[in-house]
Amino acid sequence: MQAARFVVSGVVQGVYYRACTRQRAVALGLVGHARNQADGSVDVVAAGSAAALDALEAWLCRARRPPRSRRSRARPARFRRLKTL
């Protein structure tokens, strides 16, 4: 299992972007979360197969859903490695 984190910016809060992202991730067999951030972006963390993560990244970069969203960019973000939980 692999994991990835993305930060999606633009008009992505208050337009059902997280719900649509969740639906897409579940359909791809991924687990994780999509959370609003104070700066107006959405933080997406997902785990699953490499192919499913690639598909989610492509969807995040091209998706026009929900229709009222105006995504300006989706970029991969780095995880901070933890020695212990």
Curated annotation (Swiss-Prot):
Region (Disordered): 66-85
Keyword tags: Hydrolase
Entry keyword Hydrolase: yes
Domain of life: Bacteria
GO MF annotations, alphabetized: acylphosphatase activity
Keyword flag Hydrolase: yes
EC number: 3.6.1.7
Catalytically driven reaction(s): an acyl phosphate + H2O = a carboxylate + phosphate + H(+)
The Acylphosphatase-like domain, residue ranges: 3-85
Enzyme active site: R18, N36
Family (UniProt): Belongs to the acylphosphatase family.
Protein name (database record): Acylphosphatase
Lineage: Bacteria, Pseudomonadati, Pseudomonadota, Gammaproteobacteria, Lysobacterales
